[in-house]
Amino acid sequence: MHRWVVHEFLKETTTIGQRDPRLAVTALYDSTDERGPDFTMVYGSTFTSKNYDDNIKNRVWYRKYLDDYFRINEFEVFNSPINFRLIRYADVLLMYAEALNGLNRTADAYQYVDRVRARAGLAPLATVRPGMTQAQFQQQLEHERITELTGESLRWNDLARWG
């Protein structure tokens, strides 16, 4: 995963001023815990205690479907209790909002994006970005899909659809 994905998550805070909680379940990197590498846990140890070289310290890995927080050893055995989702309701809501926006029904589309944002504790778009044009709303949808669906094998289809 690239660092720009992390930066997408850091563009907004929740309604109570905290970092987007989806970041911690999507990415594993030196500051997955916002307090830094001394608090970021990797298989039961802190990121700092691993003594990774600089090449490793600067990387970002996918955390979705990883069971590192259920285990305390160094080995991934891929027996996580986390179900693999083929399609998520959040994806359906965002696709529907995109379709409405494509039909120039941008005002109607807000409510579907807001359902996804509410689960993450983010403020409604009508509050933080009211009156967006069709193009602005599309750009916001692209951000929403990155922060909600990264690591779920949907990005290629998004890019192909957006041109």
Question: Predicted regions: what is each one?
Answer:
Residues M1, T13-G163:
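Acidic/polar-rich alpha-helix caps and helix-coil junctions
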